[in-house]
Structure formats: structure tokens, C-alpha cells
A protein has these predicted regions:
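Glycine-rich, mobile lid/loop segments that gate access to catalytic sites or pores
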Residues: 1-79, 93-99
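Terminal-appendage/accessory-domain detector
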Residues: 65-75, 82, 86-324
Length: 324
């Protein structure tokens, strides 16, 4: 999935697709085929069938359907592998058509993969989402939190003016300036910015329906102004975000080049533990700190091949004639 994403680029997202759904089905089919040790011919067929099941629209951001893209992709991947094992046929060059369809007609050279190519999960690696909101909000949240550390708000302070200058093409996905639900708030620049300033923390609790409808947050939301840089389309994953905050007698600005959790600004163990604790509290998991500490101790330096070997054994033990 990482290789496909790098191949298609962010233009795929700009066209209105959600890569979790469109690329996830192919990536999940490849992973499942690998775990089951499918013959090469069946593996190729499974990927081709999966490519015909690819779907996921950005238009559904802020609704229950957006997270369902993950399940749809996994379900379609399992079905694709099962059909391939059962003898279904598919084109040998489906990925070429896949690229033509999902890259908006852009001419793409075929990806070059061979046995010597490092796994993308290792090189260049993958990013960890730091906040449970749209990725396009992450740099603005980080910038606001850093400015908040410089200028800590006091109880009773008036709302500050927050000006956000985003990369060209960033505003369209953030389509809810006045969110009415927690899901909509995840895709609201005004809400995420106001919550980052007022609360000082953006976590799962920030995106409950009750939190999204807090009347006390409205005065600050009204002071958030969002603009895009003019000009040609920018790579949304690398283009910086400028945050300017103006309060009584002061004004400060910061340029955030990389999202927290990116390869250039990686999460720390403390960040991962905090994220796990937030998720565990939301899911009412007992003893979250002990579980997470154990995971980090067991897996930090474990070779990827060893992890996949263990996973394959667990899959085969549970599924028996999986996918048949």
C-alpha cells in the first residue's frame, strides 16, 4: 500500500479519493496472499481482483462511512484472495488500468520493485497519526500548541485571533466550518484550531458530539480565519502551514513544515504511550500502561520478518482453509 501511494502521489487524494479504501484493498490482499503463501499466479490474480474492488470517496469524510472504508477494504481483500484460490481469473495488467483510473489520466511509469528493494515499511517507513482528526489539521494543531506554550492563556482571557495559511488544495477536505457532530469536527479547521488553543490537548474526547457542540468554544471558533496559499497545487504532505495568533498586546507566528508523527518529526515512545492511553481510555481497556509498555519492550527492535512469521502462524492457525 505504501508503494502504491508513493506511485500515485497526492494527486490521487486531490481527485477526491480516500487512499485507505482505494489502496488499502490492494495492500490488504497482498498481505493476506503473503501470509497464506499463495502461488505467484494466484497472488497476481488476487491483486487484480482487489484492484477491481477499490473504492473510497473523500466526499464521505465526516460521516460514519469514512471509517467504514477500512472495513470495506479488508473485506474486499479477503474476498479477492478467496476468489483467486478458488480459480477465478483476472487480468495480468490490472494495476496499469488501476493507475490510469485513480491518477486522473496522469502518465505514470510502472513501479520498479524487485527482491533487493527494501520493504516500504522499513525504508522510507511510515507515519503515525498524532491526532484523531484529518491529517490536514495536524500541522495547524501542532503550531497552535507550540504558540500556546509560548503564550499560555489564562482563565477569563478573551478569544485570540488565529490565522491559518494552508497549502493550496487543503481547504476542500476540511469541509465543516461549523460542525454539528464529532465526526464532522474531525474535518473542521475552525474546530480543531479552537480546541487546540482552548483545551491545549486534542484527543479522542475532543471529537465526541458533546465536545463538538460546546457553546463555550464558539467565541474562539469565530476568531479562526482559514486561507489557502494561491498558485499551483502543492504536495499536501510536504507543504508548510503558517499559524499566526494575535492576542491582547502580542502577536506571534510559526511555520510548521512537517506533521508530528511524520518521518521528519517522528513520535517518541512517550507520544505512543500517550496515544495508546487515550485510545485505551476511550475503549475502556484495563491496565493500558502495562500493556503498552510490554508492547514497546517486545517489539521495538524486532525484525519485520519475525513479526510477519508470527502473524502468518496465527492467521493459519485460526483460519484453517482460509479464503477457500
Amino acid at each position: 500500500m505504501l508503494r502504491l501511494g508513493a506511485w500515485l502521489g497526492f494527486g490521487h487524494y486531490a481527485l477526491g479519493f480516500h487512499a485507505t479504501g482505494t489502496l488499502g484493498v490492494v495492500g490488504a490482499a497482498a498481505a493476506y496472499a503473503y501470509l497464506l503463501r499463495l502461488p505467484v499466479a494466484q497472488w497476481r490474480t488476487a491483486l487484480s481482483i482487489a484492484a477491481s474492488s477499490a473504492c473510497g470517496l473523500r466526499a464521505n469524510f465526516g460521516t460514519d462511512t469514512k471509517p467504514l472504508h477500512v472495513g470495506f477494504a479488508a473485506s474486499a481483500a479477503i474476498r479477492a484472495v478467496g476468489l483467486a484460490r478458488a480459480g477465478a481469473t483476472a487480468s495480468d495488467d490490472a494495476l496499469a488500468g488501476f493507475a490510469q483510473a485513480f491518477a486522473g489520466g496522469a502518465r505514470l511509469d510502472p513501479p520498479r520493485w524487485d527482491a533487493l528493494t527494501p520493504w516500504a515499511v522499513l525504508a522510507p517507513g511510515f507515519e503515525v497519526k498524532r491526532y484523531p482528526s484529518c491529517y490536514l489539521t495536524h500541522r495547524m494543531i501542532a503550531g497552535i500548541q507550540r504558540l500556546r506554550e509560548r503564550h499560555p492563556p489564562q482563565a477569563g482571557d478573551a478569544p485570540v485571533a488565529i490565522d491559518l495559511l494552508l497549502p493550496h488544495g487543503s481547504v476542500a477536505p476540511l469541509k465543516y466550518p461549523q460542525p454539528r457532530t464529532g465526526l464532522q469536527a474531525k474535518f473542521s479547521a475552525t474546530y480543531c484550531a479552537a480546541a487546540a488553543w482552548v483545551d491545549g490537548h486534542v484527543g479522542l474526547a475532543s471529537f465526541s458530539d458533546a465536545a463538538a457542540n460546546r457553546g463555550a468554544l464558539l467565541p474562539q471558533m469565530r476568531q479562526v480565519r482559514v486561507a489557502e496559499r494561491p498558485g499551483p497545487h502543492e504536495p499536501l504532505e510536504t507543504a508548510p502551514v503558517r499559524v499566526t495568533i494575535t492576542g491582547p498586546g502580542w502577536s506571534d507566528a510559526i511555520l510548521v513544515d512537517w506533521a508530528p508523527g511524520s518521518l521528519q518529526d517522528p513520535v517518541t515512545d512517550e507520544d505512543l504511550l500517550a496515544k495508546w492511553a487515550d485510545c485505551a481510555a476511550n475503549g475502556q481497556v484495563a491496565a493500558p500502561a502495562a500493556i503498552a509498555t510490554g508492547w514497546l519492550a517486545a517489539g521495538m527492535d524486532r525484525p519485520m520478518g519475525s513479526l510477519l512469521h508470527s502473524l502468518r502462524g496465527a492467521i493459519l492457525a485460526r483460519s484453517g482453509n482460509a479464503g477457500g
